[in-house]
Curated annotation (Swiss-Prot):
Membrane topology label: Multi-pass membrane protein
GO cellular component: plasma membrane
Chain's role: Plays a role in type II pseudopili formation by proteolytically removing the leader sequence from substrate proteins and subsequently monomethylating the alpha-amino group of the newly exposed N-terminal phenylalanine. Substrates include proteins required for biogenesis of the type II general secretory apparatus.
E.C. number(s) listed in UniProt: 3.4.23.43, 2.1.1.-
Keyword Transmembrane: yes
Swiss-Prot/TrEMBL catalytic activity: Typically cleaves a -Gly-|-Phe- bond to release an N-terminal, basic peptide of 5-8 residues from type IV prepilin, and then N-methylates the new N-terminal amino group, the methyl donor being S-adenosyl-L-methionine
Family per record: Belongs to the peptidase A24 family.
Gene Ontology MF term list: aspartic-type endopeptidase activity; transferase activity
One example of a Gene Ontology biological process annotation: signal peptide processing
Stated name of the protein: Prepilin leader peptidase/N-methyltransferase
Length: 230
């Protein structure tokens, strides 16, 4: 019964994820247009999203999300045996995948899922799901944010343009709420190595290499290495 419940919960979350991703750019275009009209009401023009520089991409069939995430929740339940922890870690992985997907396809890290992720990190620390205490989680999140914020401005000053996106330091803050501050150098090194290896293997695939997927993968690896006590 618990496995069916987890499958159904995962499937429902998969459907919610599909709706979020399939309409993300459309909602973004509408928000930008609404802000433009509010700022320049005298220059109001018809809403023409098909002329926008960024367009919504297909994200697969809704049933793929339902079944894949539903089955994923079953495997998480089998692995961890704790239903509440399974839901917590499952939601975390869904948000990580969402951030990675958006950055990969649109070179955009929305602050909204980053704040969701931060909330889950702090919630997990406060309820003993995480490897950190609540105070450690807050300290680590703040430190990750500061370090990446400094890196952002140093890179911008050195290159004369944005080498990192502003979303990177918001994502770093969220990831920092899950892993110890002492692992920050390992986190940076592993994310960079993963990005470099991918770019060397697929050097002609992308002109711009999104960093969020490698940051997320680095955090997941470090978290589970610490979780299993290595």
């Amino acid at each position: 019964m618990i496995y069916f419940t987890m499958f159904l919960l995962g499937g429902i979350l998969g459907i919610a994820l599909w709706f979020y991703l399939s309409g993300f750019i459309t909602r973004l275009q509408q928000n930008i247009y609404a802000i433009y009209v509010e700022l320049f009401p005298q220059n109001r023009s018809p809403f023409q999203p098909h002329f926008a520089s960024i367009q919504q991409k297909k994200c697969g069939h809704i049933l793929r999300y339902f079944f894949s995430i539903g089955v994923g929740f079953i495997f998480l339940q089998i692995a961890f045996k704790d239903s509440i922890f399974t839901v917590w870690i499952g939601l975390t992985l869904i948000i990580l995948w969402t951030i990675s997907y958006l950055d990969w396809h649109y070179q955009l890290i929305s602050t909204t899922p980053c704040l969701w992720l931060l909330t889950l990190g702090l919630f997990g620390a406060d309820n003993n799901f995480s490897l950190l205490t609540l105070s450690e989680s807050i300290k680590s999140a703040a430190s990750f944010f500061i370090v990446f914020y400094v890196i952002y401005w140093l890179a911008k000053f050195y290159y004369g343009k944005e080498a990192f996106g502003r979303g990177d330091y918001w994502l770093a803050m969220a990831l920092g709420s899950f892993i110890h501050l002492e692992t920050l150098p390992h986190f940076l090194l592993l994310a960079s190595v993963l990005g470099i290896c991918f770019s060397l293997i697929h050097r002609k695939k992308k002109e711009f290499l999104p960093f969020a997927p490698f940051m997320n993968l680095s955090a997941v690896i470090i978290y589970f290495v610490k979780y299993y006590g290595y």
